[in-house]
Amino acid sequence: MSETGIIPKSTDYTDWPADVCKYSQVFEDVLVVGTYMLDESTKLRHGKLVLYDTKEDVLKRVFDMHCDAILDFKWSPHDASVLAVAHSTGHVSFYRHQFRAELMFLRGIKVADSSVLMLSLDFSDSGKELAVSMSNGSVLIIDIDSGVIKNKWKEHDYEAWTCHYSRQDNNLLYSGGDDAALVCYDQRIPNSCIWRDIQVHHSGVVSILSRAPFGPYIATGEYGDFMHTLDTRNIGKPLFSANLGGGVWRLEHMETTENYHKVLGILMHRGAQVLRISNDFSSIDASKRIFKEHESMCYGGDWRHTDGLLATCSFYDKRVCLWEDI
C-alpha cells in the first residue's frame, strides 16, 4: 500500500525560521513555537517565543516575545507551567506560562561561553535537574535551584545534538553526537561515560527516546534517515532498524497501548509521520499517511493531549501546521 499525504487543518507562517513546538501543559490548546534566525550582517542569532491559540483547530497567534535564538525547549515535570529554553548563546532560560496569552521570563542560567549553542535539553523526572547538550560536544547536568553545574562530560568530537535521561533509571543519561556516537553516563561516576557506541549509527545521532513503559529499551534517530530500537543491556546491535526516508530529528512519545508505543517522528526534509513501535521493540511500523506540507526541514512537532491534534513546524519556510493522522 502506497503512502498518502495529509492536508493541514490550519497553517501559519512565523517571522523567523521555526525549529521547535510544544503544546502547553497548563492551557492544553495553546501551542508554543520557538524560532532561530541568524543575521548574516552581524552574525548575531535572534529568536522568538510565539504562542498560538488552537482552540478551534485553527492557528491564532496571540503572543510573541523576543529572546536569543532557540534550539530546544521542554516543560518541567515538577511545575507544569515552567518552560526551559535552550539558547544559542551559552545559556538556558526559564519562563512561566501562567496566563493563556502570555509567557513570563523567570531567570537565566549561564553555563558556557556565549559562542556555544545549547542544542538540546531534558528535565530529570523530579524536575530538579536539567541536562543540556552543546555544540562543543559537551554534556552537563545543572541543579536548577542553585544554577550549579553538577556533572560535565566531553565524550563527543563534534556537536552533541541531543541528550535524554533514562526513564528506567534517572541516574543514567544518554547523548548523541555528530560523530555518530551514542553515549551513556552515570551521574554517580563523574568525568567519564559508562559506554560509548559507534557501531549502530552511521551518521549523526540527533534523537533519543526513553520512557518508563519502555523498560531497558530506547529508540534513536540519525541524520541518515534511520531509526533504531536498542536494548541498553546489549547496545552494540539494534533490535530493529527502519529507513524512514528523512533524517529522524525528533521522536515524540504519544501513547503506549497494550500492543505498541505510538511515536511522532519528525523527519527533517521528508515531513512528519506517526510510528508504532512494538512493545518488545522488535519492529517499527510507519503509518501509511505522512504529512509532507513542510517545504524544507521539519524540526519540531507535538500532539495535543486532549484529542491528539498534531502540530509541526519547519525551518526555511517558517511554517506551522495543525493536522490529523486519521
UniProtKB/Swiss-Prot annotation:
Function text: Catalyzes the demethylation of diphthine methyl ester to form diphthine, an intermediate in diphthamide biosynthesis, a post-translational modification of histidine which occurs in translation elongation factor 2 (eft201 and eft202).
Pfam families (UniProt xref): ANAPC4_WD40, WD40
Transmembrane segments: none
SMART domains: WD40
Catalytic activity: diphthine methyl ester-[translation elongation factor 2] + H2O = diphthine-[translation elongation factor 2] + methanol + H(+)
Keywords: Cytoplasm, Hydrolase, Nucleus, Repeat, WD repeat
Gene3D superfamilies, per the entry: YVTN repeat-like/Quinoprotein amine dehydrogenase
Coiled coil: none
Protein name: Diphthine methyltransferase
Top EC class of this enzyme: hydrolase
Domain of life: Eukaryota
UniProt keyword annotation of Transit peptide present: no
WD repeats: 65-105, 113-152, 155-195, 293-326
A Gene Ontology biological process term: protein histidyl modification to diphthamide
MF GO annotations: diphthine methylesterase activity
GO cellular component: cytoplasm; cytosol; nucleus
Annotated family: Belongs to the DPH7 family.
Documented EC number(s): 3.1.1.97
Main location: cytoplasm
Pathway: Protein modification; peptidyl-diphthamide biosynthesis
Subcellular location: Cytoplasm; Nucleus
Organism: Schizosaccharomyces pombe (strain 972 / ATCC 24843) (Fission yeast)
Gene symbol of the encoding locus: rrt2
